[in-house]
Amino acid sequence: MPLNHLSLLVIFPLTLLVSESVIASKLIQPQYLDSERTDLFFAREIAQPSQENIDMRNSFDWGYELELSRTSGETKSVSNCKDLTKANLAGFTAAKAYEYGAFKAYLMQCQTWSEVAKLAASKRSFISKLKLDDNFPKFAPSALAFVISDESEEKVKTLPTWDEADHIQSTRVVSEVRAEYFDATGGFQVITVVAKGDYNADGIEDIVIEKENSVLSGLYSSSHGYVLTRMSEQASFTVLAEW
């Protein structure tokens, strides 16, 4: 019995709906893995990161204030990422010298949340089996190297991997998303996987990480964020973004 026009009008939209559902089910949704860090950052309990609320992280109140000042003598206090970012652009910095490291770490964390909010679902992944272990530095880009001078930075740019730049001596895996690396010059470096998702709309799953640098016999410290990607499971990582 031939289909009439009414039947076709019903079947066609249903076919499209089923097809869209199949495609959506094959997509790899963004993963937000920074719940522990988020819990430490805010004084009160907030909802776990999700695609719906991740972009709100910058406006959430921390539950405490950070004192800032600038060369004109003007001072102000901020208690959320949005205000901190604006103050930094206006020339404010930590009011107390010993809080400068915290000030820079806060800026980095706030920028990380802004970058994570850009993640979308991906179609393919070459990082599903990624582990923060002894092998990771051999595939990570030299941009992750612990540098404290312009001269060192220029030298590092000529090297292909993080391991070749810092000569990692030992690794301590803290969890599936965090590991500590000790280099040949007394550097102590912590890598945290913050999130996974498609950052640059090419359909490939990328990874957002944070890196904290310090020295075992000194006070120097720095914090950095990166988006890394690779085109096969055996390929080295490249940097898509850095802050």
Q: Where do the PLM segments sit?
A:
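Acidic carboxylate motifs that coordinate Ca2+ or other divalent cations, activating on Asp/Glu
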Residues: D202
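Bacterial N-terminal signal peptides that target proteins for export
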Residues: M1-V10
